[in-house]
Amino acid sequence: MADLMFIPLLERALQARASLFDARHETAFRLFNGFTEGEPNLVVDLYASTLLLHNYADDPTDGRLIAEGAAHFLQGQLPWLHAGIIKIRSSKSQAERNGYLLFGEKPDTKVREHDVWYSIDLTMNRDASFYLDTRDLRQWLIENSRDKTALNMFAYTGSLGVASLAGGAKRVIQHDLNRQFLNVAKTSYSLNGFPIRKEDFVAADFFTLAAKLIFE
C-alpha cells in the first residue's frame, strides 16, 4: 500500500466537513481538495453514497496507489459507502479518464441539494456530470428565480436551470451542443416533477443559435 502520510490530511478533511454530511446520504460535496489540503495528486468527492476519487498524478501509477489507499481508509470511516469510482486524469485511456469502478457494484445516479434532486452520470465523461463548486450559485438561483425566464447557455447537464425551475422560474431554456448532457437534465426534471418541453432543450452550436435568437 502507498505511503499513508496523507491519512491525517483526510482525517482533518472529514472533521472540517462534518456538517455537510446528511443522514440519508443523498447530498454531494468535495470531501478533500488535495490541491489546497496537502496532497495535490488526489481529490475526493462524495456523491450520495458513492465515493469519487480523482487521480491527478503525472504518473498514474503513483496516483493510483494514493487513491486506493484513500479509498480503503474512507471506507472504514464511512461504512455506508456502497460504491467507489476512480478517474485517472493523465491516463491515455478514455475509459480511465472517465472513471471505472474501484469497489462496489452500482454508483449512485442522483443527488439531492437544497431539497432539489439532480441526476448524475459519474462516468459519462472526464467530469462527473455535476459541478460541486456551483453549489452556492444553485442556492442563489433557487432564491431569486421566481417568475423569471432564463436561458442557460452551455448548460452541460442543466443543474443551474433545474435550480431556477425549483425557485419558481416561468421558463428555462437549456442549451448545449451535446444532446447526451441535456438528457441528464431531462432526468433531473423528472426527478423533481417538472414538465419536460421539447422546445426548451436545444442541442445546437452556440454561434448558430445566438444568430437565430438575435434575428428573431
Model regions: which residues?
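Cysteine-centered catalytic environments shared across enzyme families
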Residues: 7-26, 64-86
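Conserved SAM-binding motif I beta-strand of class I
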Residues: 171-176
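Non-catalytic substrate-recognition/targeting regions of SAM-dependent transferases
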Residues: 38, 42-45, 66-132, 139, ...
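Non-catalytic accessory regions of SAM-dependent methyltransferases
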Residues: 1-50, 56
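Conserved SAM-binding loop of SAM-dependent methyltransferases across substrates and taxa
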Residues: 157-170
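Phosphate-coordination loops involved in phosphoryl transfer and adenosine-cofactor binding
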Residues: 146-147, 169
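Conserved class I S-adenosyl-L-methionine
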Residues: 147-156
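S-adenosyl-L-methionine
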Residues: 178-216
